[in-house]
């Protein structure tokens, strides 16, 4: 709407007509805050918008391109929602199968396996090694579940008591070292940093002033700390491309893009084009891993179902052979 000539307040009033009561009440409060002089990004933050979307609008108010940046933040949120919906569709049926097989495992452990074991003991039959292994598995499955619960609880405790107390740079370093996840984190860092730096440079700000814009925001602590580090290195006489090149948090080709952009005199354009390439790579990797995850889950479910059948058939065949 703002791109079509509406003021921000007029656009919000029109949106209010299409919302439910709770959303309309939030929007009314937002309009009041804007009239009182609150920045638009603070209004979004108070409404619990995604922090990356809030960040985009913060930088937009710095360089004066709020309509275009609102479109960018909307597209970012739409992509995140679409990826989350795709993941839900992929996982919905496999998770239902896992739940069903888990119920079957419980019935086997609590009813069927004890009956087979009692029959073997009452008839003085010897069990084969495969049957012993199946019985032992179901006898100790509770221990496996307890260990999984303890492991999950341990991760939660570590996150709240240790991870959250670390510095933003240290938190990001831990995330980057996680297999598979780390590559996606580096790609997103490169995408977000290059896109926002491009917008700030396009508005006429210098690299130093653009980094100061990153430094003075409060809702993206990692980028604030990164800006502080980069500013200190620039003051020491180091170029921004060499400072980025030595960082573990970005793709290695980001520094090359910055160097090429400075040589061509169109750093803002080079960074924006690079950010779109990175966005395509992110979407490709998300689709790739979603496609890999579903067959893996189906394979796990198939193995569980096979184990269920073996646990019932193997003891029966052995009993028939010994009779």
From Swiss-Prot:
Segments forming a coiled coil: none
Alphabetized PROSITE patterns for the sequence: T2SP_F
InterPro entries hit by this protein: GspF/PilC, T2SS_GspF/T4SS_PilC_CS, T2SS_GspF_dom, T2SS_GspF_sf, T4P_ComGB
Recorded superkingdom: Bacteria
Membrane-spanning ranges: 93-113, 143-163, 296-316
GO CC annotation terms, alphabetical: plasma membrane
Swiss-Prot/TrEMBL keywords: Cell membrane, Competence, Membrane, Transmembrane, Transmembrane helix, Transport
Membrane topology, from the record: Multi-pass membrane protein
GO biological process terms on file: establishment of competence for transformation; protein secretion
Subcellular location: Cell membrane
Subcellular location, principal: membrane
Annotated PANTHER family: GENERAL SECRETION PATHWAY PROTEIN, TYPE II SECRETION SYSTEM PROTEIN F-RELATED
Family assignment from sequence similarity: Belongs to the GSP F family.
Function: Required for transformation and DNA binding.
Name of the protein described by the UniProt record: ComG operon protein 2
Gene name tied to this protein: comGB
């Amino acid at each position: 709407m703002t791109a079509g000539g509406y003021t921000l307040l007029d656009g919000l009033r029109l949106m209010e007509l299409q919302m439910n009561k709770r959303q309309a009440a939030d929007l009314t409060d937002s309009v009041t805050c804007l009239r009182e002089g609150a920045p638009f990004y603070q209004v979004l933050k108070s409404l619990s918008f995604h922090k990356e979307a809030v960040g985009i609008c913060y930088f937009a108010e710095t360089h004066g391109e709020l309509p275009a940046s609102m479109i960018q933040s909307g597209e970012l949120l739409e992509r995140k929602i679409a990826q989350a919906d795709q993941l839900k569709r992929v996982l919905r049926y496999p998770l239902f199968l896992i739940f069903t097989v888990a119920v079957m495992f419980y019935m086997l452990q609590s009813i069927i396996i004890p009956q087979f074991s009692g029959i073997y003991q009452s008839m003085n039959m010897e069990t084969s090694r495969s049957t012993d292994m199946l019985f032992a598995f179901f006898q100790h499955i509770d221990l496996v579940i307890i260990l999984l619960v303890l492991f999950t609880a341990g991760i939660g405790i570590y996150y709240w008591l240790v991870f959250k107390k670390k510095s933003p740079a240290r938190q990001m370093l831990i995330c980057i070292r996680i297999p598979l996840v780390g590559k996606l984190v580096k790609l997103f860092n490169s995408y977000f940093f290059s896109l926002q730096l491009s917008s700030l440079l396009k508005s006429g700000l210098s690299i130093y002033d653009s980094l100061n814009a990153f430094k003075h925001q409060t809702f993206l602590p990692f980028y604030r700390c990164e800006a502080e580090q980069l500013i200190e290195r620039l003051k020491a006489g180091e170029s921004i491309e060499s400072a980025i090149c030595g960082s573990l948090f970005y793709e290695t080709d980001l520094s090359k893009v910055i160097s090429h952009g400075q040589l061509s005199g169109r750093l803002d354009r080079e960074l924006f084009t690079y950010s779109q390439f990175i966005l395509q790579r992110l979407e490709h990797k998300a689709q790739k891993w979603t496609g890999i995850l579903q067959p893996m889950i189906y394979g796990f479910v198939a193995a569980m179902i096979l184990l269920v059948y073996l646990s019932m058939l193997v003891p029966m065949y052995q009993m028939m052979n010994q009779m």
